[in-house]
Amino acid sequence: MYNRYQQMNSAYLNLEDLIKEAGLTIPSGLCSSSSASENPFPEPIQYVCAPARKLKFMLVGTHAHQTTGYSKVTYHIIQELAKHRDEFEVFHFGFQKFMAQPTDYRNYPPGIDVHDPVEVEKSGAAPKEMGFGFSQLPAYVRKVKPDVMLIYNDAGVICQFLDKLSSELSASERNYKLIIYLDQVYEIQRPQFLARIDQDAHSYFAFTMYWKQVLQKQGIKKPIHVLRHGFDPTQFKPMDRGAARKKHGIPENLFIFLNLNRNTPRKRHDIVVQAFAHLVARNPTKPLALLEVCDGGEGGGYPIQEIYMRTLESLNVPIQHHAHKLMISKQSLTYTDELINELYVLSDVGITAADGEGFGLCQFEAMGIGIPQVVPLIGGFRDFCTPDNSQLVVPKYRSYLALGSSSIGGIAELVDPFDLSIAAENYVMDSDLRTRHGEAARRTVLGYEWSKEVGNLIRVLRDVAKE
């Protein structure tokens, strides 16, 4: 019995000799084995392979401590990638961190390397570039040497980053695979922007399938994937409406329309307040209110209060009886996610008249807690707003944008204020419809899970790692 075992053991120990006799080879450096022992009962041979190198992934996008929609998306992308730290090293070139946040606000996971261009600009060590840090990116690339870089923004900003990289880095220093996560808000992109981006891009991500098709129609032949925004039900969730209204001093019987968009030209607050004036004119005795969570035009946007008053006057409505129904909150960029959740909860309906929309995160989040929306049938809204969960308003006008007012150009799709007011009125007059659409809206948005959406990016990164 002992001799038989010894023969078996000897054959086992001479495995490499047997392989050589068979004319096979073992790749050098791939594996190493433990040496043979004089012990007639040695330990099993252990082959120890070098661990696979992690893929270095660099995200160039808004800092997670900003309060914009961009920042929410970058935050959740990083959170999901951090769950795969055995595969990826994650680096974030996080621009436009203009404000300090509480220590518990959107903390980065351990092990994430974050570069803050704003901090460097403030120190005087780099030129001031609106917090984007275009001039700082090449040095960060040299430091990190990423395998894959993803740039997330609109075409104009992306082109500025690409120009800076190509002018300051050699071809060998730009041997990363470049993925473009393109924010499209209008149906056309300026051809020179697309040509510049496509020159360097390895592949693309679009916000929705609709935007993927729009990009393909403009001649992009490289792979285009879809990375929709996700919804975090632990961050935005239903609360007691009565308690929220009491906290903010809002009467329980008030019917509130909420617009949480910034007062920028694209968001068309002028159309929203005109529509609300039409609604008030037709329903003067109803306790209606429009809460505009933005500045009143002091920052260069629409003079909301003035437009509302003039529209009431043009409709022969006594201004003094209805001026108070427009409520303007002027601190939209400093609101935390917790406070935004309360604003969603205390509202009855959300409303917007944006003439272009990449995704529509404000409407999306409100729908996630059961607040139905009145929206134009455009862009990103097409993905999650349907006749079964929203009031959709078909745009009546299309207008090319002057480059002096919009550097990215495009065709704006404009709804008529009167049409928007009719859609809003449907919810005022039909509480059952409002409830039904709110429930359907929540079901729809709960299906957008960050883990699933970012999973599309992870699959692409794994494929790139195999190339």
Model regions and ranges:
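A short helix/loop element that forms part of the nucleotide-sugar donor recognition site in Leloir-type
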Residues: 42, 237-250
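Nucleotide-activated donor-binding/catalytic signature segment of Leloir-type glycosyltransferases, i.e.
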Residues: 302-342
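Carbohydrate-associated surface elements
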Residues: 210, 230
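Aromatic "clamp/platform" in nucleotide-sugar-dependent glycosyltransferases that forms part
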Residues: 355
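A charged, aromatic-enriched C-terminal amphipathic alpha-helix characteristic of glycosyltransferases
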Residues: 415, 419, 429-459
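Conserved donor-binding/catalytic core segment of Leloir-type glycosyltransferases
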Residues: 58-59, 251-267, 273-276, 290-292
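C-terminal alpha-helical cap of glycosyltransferases
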Residues: 8, 15, 23, 44-45, ...
